[in-house]
Amino acid sequence: GRLDATNAVGVPDVTVITKIGYDHMAVLGNTLAEIAAEKTGIIKKGTSLVLESQEAEVMTVFEAKVREEGITDFRLIDPLEIKEQTYRDGRQYFSFGAYRDLSMRMLGVHQYENAIAALLGAEAFFRRHTEWICGGTKEREEGVRRAVCQGIAKTVWKGRMEILSKKPFLLVDGAHNSNGVEALRE
């Protein structure tokens, strides 16, 4: 956000913003709109923006910032676009747009949007740097996309919805705010 150390870097190629919740309220504000206003400080003219679905009051703040900065490469993740959500063998599977049968080891319905945010953020980066990364060929571009999907499939976040034992069932999660507790409940 506005106070984030990453602002010292300048204009990022891509900005990805996940679900806004009540966290760090002493610094960011007491309402979702106040917190969102602080978070929009990371959005700069010329960046690509990927935004997870948000509460209506948060979306109002983000939409105003997008207009103010003239952001043209903006993707809002619609949870209704996430298809074929299943769980088997300790993994979650899903499809999104052209991506079929994606898998991940991270558990929880919130992780679908997080994984898609990573995919769309990578796509936005690739759009800016295709020649540099892919050498301009479709085959290389597809190879890079496969690599991103493989990275998501292999990602583990210790202490987040982590099943330590099935018998007896023992799940560990470091939820520390209302969004985290809600995700754990779901």
Language-model-detected regions and their locations in the chain:
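Glycine/threonine-rich flexible loop motifs
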Residues: 2-6, 26-29
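Nucleotide phosphate-binding/pyrophosphate-handling subdomain across enzymes
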Residues: 3-16, 20-21, 34, 98-186
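Acidic, Mg2+-coordinating active-site environments of NTP-dependent enzymes
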Residues: 12, 16-102, 115, 119-134, ...
